[in-house]
């Protein structure tokens, strides 16, 4: 059993506080230490503008992200056309106004330290 004290708290994504699911993906949230951390898991073929936009109600993701890629690869394209492929170990900042999609045939997993509470939410 994991400790649950006021000065020490350990949580795991195997038991998240919240799970947001959508076609080809899921976003798990852990609330700890006054912040919300998210774990994104997307299947090959996932694309934000196709699979999350209907939930968010916008054509591009308007959430600001800071995170790290754990496995797989994803491309990110900004509204002005700039794009980048994110790979395992990349620590990223992505501003509002972007699309993203899985690159290749491996699932993509990343941790999000900024923006998690607003992601895949109306």
Regions found by a protein language model. Give the residues of each.
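A short, N-terminal "cap"/entry segment at the start of jelly-roll beta-barrel domains
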Residues: 1-41, 49
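Short, acidic/polar N-cap/turn motifs at the starts of alpha helices
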Residues: 17-19, 26-27, 37, 64, ...
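Glycine- and acidic-residue-biased ligand/ion/polar-headgroup-sensing regions
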Residues: 35, 54-80
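A short hydrophobic beta-strand segment most commonly corresponding to one strand
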Residues: 39-40, 93-94, 99, 104-122
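Conserved short histidine dyad/triad with adjacent acidic residue
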Residues: 39-60
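Short beta-strand segments in beta-sandwich/barrel cores
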Residues: 47-48, 72-77, 100
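Short acidic-glycine-tyrosine-enriched beta hairpin
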Residues: 78-97
């Amino acid at each position: 059993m994991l400790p649950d004290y006021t000065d020490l708290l350990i949580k795991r994504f195997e038991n998240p506080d919240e799970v947001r699911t959508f076609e080809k993906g899921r976003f798990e949230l852990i609330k700890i230490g006054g912040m919300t951390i998210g774990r994104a898991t997307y299947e090959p073929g996932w694309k934000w503008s196709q699979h999350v936009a209907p939930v968010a109600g916008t054509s591009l993701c308007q959430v600001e992200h800071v995170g790290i890629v754990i496995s797989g690869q994803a491309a990110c394209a900004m509204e002005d056309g700039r794009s980048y492929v994110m790979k395992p170990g990349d620590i990223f900042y992505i501003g509002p106004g972007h699309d993203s999609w899985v690159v290749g045939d491996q699932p993509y997993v990343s941790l999000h330290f900024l923006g998690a509470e607003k992601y895949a939410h109306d």
